[in-house]
Amino acid sequence: MAKNTNITTVADNRKARFSYEVIDTLEAGLVLSGTEVKSLREGHANIQESYAAVEGGEIWLINSHIPEYFAGNRFNHEPRRRRKLLLSKKEMARLAQAVEREGMTMVPLKLYFNERGIAKLLLAIARGKKLHDKRETLKQRDWSREQARLLKERG
């Protein structure tokens, strides 16, 4: 099978950018079984309700859903199992510090295959937005749409 030369997005967490203020992002690898990779290659995954947590000095992706591979029979994986994230020790220490000291959270933004065909997760260090911040974001979005519409009508 020929490898793709471009990045293929499998799952996108668009709600995270609305609900959280993204401070920093980094790329992490995932420990996956064979049937999970096959299911991801078909484009099946959901990271909307997932988050990352530090447990025992390691970082885990919790509550992500990768459905069973239809041809996997008895070797199939559990769809909502915890998945270990592959990061350097320096990155793990920085994430653990941000979560514990600064009260931030780790939110997955995007699950994709890189140009070498390896599954990667774009992980964000984020701070939760308050309700008034979310309303302000909606107002800004509506105003920018209105501006674009007005400019299109005039010019």
Curated annotation (Swiss-Prot):
GO terms for biological process: trans-translation. It is found in: Cytoplasm. Keywords: Cytoplasm, RNA-binding. Transmembrane segments: none annotated. One of its GO terms (molecular function) is RNA binding. The keyword Cytoplasm applies. Gene3D superfamilies: 2.40.280.10. One of its GO terms (cellular component) is cytosol. Its main location: cytoplasm. The keyword RNA-binding applies. It comes from the Bacteria. HAMAP family: SmpB. Belongs to the SmpB family. Required for rescue of stalled ribosomes mediated by trans-translation. Binds to transfer-messenger RNA (tmRNA), required for stable association of tmRNA with ribosomes. tmRNA and SmpB together mimic tRNA shape, replacing the anticodon stem-loop with SmpB. tmRNA is encoded by the ssrA gene; the 2 termini fold to resemble tRNA(Ala) and it encodes a 'tag peptide', a short internal open reading frame. During trans-translation Ala-aminoacylated tmRNA acts like a tRNA, entering the A-site of stalled ribosomes, displacing the stalled mRNA. This is SsrA-binding protein. The lineage of its organism: Bacteria, Pseudomonadati, Pseudomonadota, Alphaproteobacteria, Hyphomicrobiales.
